[in-house]
Amino acid sequence: QGEVVGRLIPGESELAPALMFLADDTLETADREKAEARLQLWLKAHIDTLVKPLRDLEEGEGLEGLARGVAFRLVESLGILERSEISEDVRQLDQTMRAGLRKLGVRFGAYHIFVPALLKPAPSRLIAQLWALKNGSPDMPGLDELPQLSASGRTSIAVDPEISPALYKVVGFRVCGPRAVRIDILERLADLIRPLLAWKPLDPAVSPPEGAIAEGGGFTVTVAMTSLLGCAGEDFSAVLKSLGYRSETREIQRPVVAAPAEAAGAEVPKPAADDGSDPAPAVTASEDPAETPGAADDTSTVEVAAQPAAASAPT
């Protein structure tokens, strides 16, 4: 009938809150115990259903040794670990151990080890509420807003200084300077950047893909990257910097094409076939011909993001 019959209070862990039963004093002891047991059973089933991947990792079926330790760390951190926090353990995992963790829903990303299923709206909201119950308060700033923003499809949001950075992480965002970016979106960004960093100029006749630089070892920001994160300019640069990339300014050579002569009667040679290139400019002879700048180069600069020290493909 919509009446409050219980209240959650902090328990042994975030995933095991205690229940304060609020019953009418007229209830007899036996009836009260039955009602409380039923409520406890419902609460456990509700939590277990929404955070099933964490329960599976707790059980660790098929996991041994170091893999079980990684699973424990993931449960402890509610399904999200920055890769740098556990990099040594991850390096020591063999393929069998990795396969066992993947079978339980774990993804090994470039920046995070996480469980994507827990980023869905329902489990994400519940995990945030349980975390706040244990580590903050039910009315802490951002507890209602962050899960809503994540569920709305926002890939990044402006950081609110009133909201705890830990709460951003619990909901599935990573604070990157002035922006908080969803961790699954950061992994998609890594997927865009990785082939650009790996590109090498093996054949001078082959142009680099969009975003790669001719000499290799870096990349320039593309529209696909900024569209993915929903931010650009200084905010996007701050995101890259927080991930360990550094910005460099490099000179590039752009060929200057001489302007066509305007003298009357100048004959412009017709190309034999249209190959997609611009036609060569016509030059009119004179007694004192001016020097044609056709071979000159225009030097300009471009911002290039260089590879961070630890950047590599996730394994």
Predicted regions: what is each one?
Residues Q1-G233, A238-V239, L243-I252, A259-A264:
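Acidic, serine/threonine- and proline-rich low-complexity intrinsically disordered segments
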